[in-house]
Amino acid sequence: PILPQKWYFKNSIDYSISLNYAVLNYAARYKDELLYNIYTMGRHSIEAGSKDSWTLYPKRADALSELLKTEKPTGKIDSFQLAVFNKVYKNPVTRDPRGYIIPINQSTTAIQFVNILIKSGIKVHRASSDFMVGTKKYLSGSYIVKTNQAFRPHVLDMFEPQDHPNDFLYPGGPPVRPYDAAGWTPAFTMGIDFDRILEDFTGPFDALAYGDIQKPLGKIINSQYNSYGYTFSTKDNASYIAVNELLNAGEIVYKNKEQYFVRHSDKINNSITKLSTDYGILFTNVTTPLSDTLKKIQPIRIGLWDKYGGSMSSGWLRWIFEQYHFPFKLIYAKEIDSVNLNANYDV
């Protein structure tokens, strides 16, 4: 323990340096054991993903506790406890998946998710032709993530619900908040369509090289016909890039609940072709006016608060705006206090 005293930033730095030296010293002394343990963990993960396995989630521990309260022992207590344990932890329905399949026929966000997996060192396969798993057909180009790999725990974290224990201050009392992030699963938050496969499966799968970042393949459907205009989905995040690029170029963009629409012109045709190629956006050429009511989209004037020296929250929003090509202007306290913001900005 540290006695109460005047504290300087140097003290904190000294603590960090001493900790760094301790870690380096430990690694130097036990390098063989550390490297072998890393290998062993990877081997165990591969073995677990190659057979029926169950993760010991907190919810299953709770289910086991409840079952032990209601089940009555018959015979030896050890045999009874094992039988109850197997009811919960060896239930075939609750097995961990042998792998996940990400169908190719969905939005470009699925490719972004696949790239997250690739960047974190997860082995990903891609189907070279159509294939069947069970009774379901998957198209060529679909992505496959098997769990018989060294980073299996991370694979499960990317696809499975986060399961935190029910931690209460006292029985019947308020819950104790988790120390850190309590519930984010990228496959859920990104809205990815995927299937959990509980049985071992094979197919025409090609392993992607580590670091082989994927690019969505866009196209223009019905491009061979005379064009009245083009539609593209409101459900694809990449569509925001297309809308902002078109608006920034002075084009008129319309939308209804399901799709955006732009009228055909030689200039629009060139823009659509480039957007489809660069960002993998799927456009559909239409030959007649749409029957649905369309609303004209107005360009939006965004003012983004920031402070001199930078702000983490402002920087995050700025990064998001830049990724999807939203025009914005940084505003600081002086401007906020001295001008009519409503006259200069919409949001």
List each model region and its residues.
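Intrinsic-disorder/low-complexity accessory segments
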Residues: 1-347
